[in-house]
């Protein structure tokens, strides 16, 4: 059971998925989750902490992958037990689905068509957040959702994270948010990933670049369209983060950005 998922609806007050790109240490996870929880609680925002135990989808073997499954497991579980904060994490192989310390499983964009992975995630009974592949049209997501449903999952989230636009670049078509919602009669929550959307895949050769200054603009546009929630990777020192620093939002900017998004969300949803 996920209280976050139960409170995340397209017509409800904006929900937030936030946290650093990757799990760095138990202490760092508790610090980040605690800071984000404090902000979201003060603003009455439905919040779940995101982190990754392995960055397996990387072009270069020189890219940082993480501390490993076991260490991340105990640290992620500490966030849940010590802080009472739910956790969302991505899975890359079927065996991981039943083993991770997470309340919501996330299917990476590059793996959104992997049937065995979707099946394993669905069979856990946990909500599944599937990211739309950078190579997929929003209308094709109906097939991904149907596949999850066929394996017994009726708690699905769909996340937009941009579409490949030439080399080392992504573009966001805001129409996709409406199309993904319209495609699914169950009205599953639609989420906007505001930080990976400003990524420059492979932009630094052996790692990705990005433009974090564009995160607030992408977020405001998505909330103006109307979404269930936003996904934002946040770090207290993104310039020195192990990975994805160029597109992570600085923790110091998280609250003011979120306050503006809530103002827009209120207008769009007429005071929900």
Regions found by a protein language model. Give the residues of each.
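N-terminal amphipathic alpha-helix/helix-capping segment at the start of soluble metabolic enzymes
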Residues: 1-17, 74, 266-272
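Short, well-ordered coil/turn segments that N-cap beta-strands
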Residues: 11-15, 43-47, 81-87, 102-103, ...
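Glycine-rich, proline-tolerant flexible connector loops at the mouths of alpha/beta enzymes
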Residues: 16, 20-29, 47-69, 234-245
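Glycine-rich anion/phosphate-binding loops
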Residues: 23-36, 67-74, 209-217
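Alpha-helix-loop-beta-strand connector modules within alpha/beta enzyme cores
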Residues: 36-43, 62-88, 120-127, 177-190, ...
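Catalytic beta/alpha-barrel core
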Residues: 67-68, 82-97, 103-116, 126-138, ...
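Catalytic alpha/beta core domains of metabolic enzymes, predominantly
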Residues: 125, 129-234
């Amino acid at each position: 059971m996920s209280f976050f998922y139960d409170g995340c609806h397209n017509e409800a007050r904006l929900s937030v998925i936030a946290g650093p790109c990757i799990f760095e240490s138990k202490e760092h996870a508790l610090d980040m989750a605690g800071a984000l929880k404090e902000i979201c609680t003060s603003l009455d925002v439905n919040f779940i902490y995101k982190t990754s135990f392995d960055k397996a989808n990387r072009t270069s073997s020189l890219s940082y992958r993480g501390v490993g499954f076991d260490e991340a497991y105990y640290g992620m579980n500490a966030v849940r037990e010590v802080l009472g904060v739910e956790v969302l994490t991505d899975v890359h192989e079927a065996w991981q689905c039943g083993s991770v310390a997470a309340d919501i499983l996330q299917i990476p964009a590059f793996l959104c068509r992997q049937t065995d992975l979707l099946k394993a995630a669905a069979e856990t009974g946990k909500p599944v957040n599937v990211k739309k592949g950078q190579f997929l049209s929003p209308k094709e997501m109906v097939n991904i959702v149907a596949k999850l449903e066929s394996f017994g999952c009726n708690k699905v989230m769909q996340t937009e994270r941009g579409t490949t636009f030439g080399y080392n670049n992504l573009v966001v078509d805001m129409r996709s948010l409406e199309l993904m919602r319209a495609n699914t009669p169950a009205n599953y929550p639609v989420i906007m990933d505001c930080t990976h959307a400003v990524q420059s895949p492979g932009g630094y050769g052996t790692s990705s670049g990005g433009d974090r200054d564009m995160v607030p603009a992408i977020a405001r546009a998505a909330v103006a369209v109307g979404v269930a929630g936003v996904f934002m990777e946040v770090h207290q020192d993104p310039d020195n983060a192990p990975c994805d620093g160029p597109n992570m939002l600085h923790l110091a900017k998280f609250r003011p950005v979120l306050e503006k998004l809530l103002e827009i969300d209120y207008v769009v949803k007429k005071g929900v």
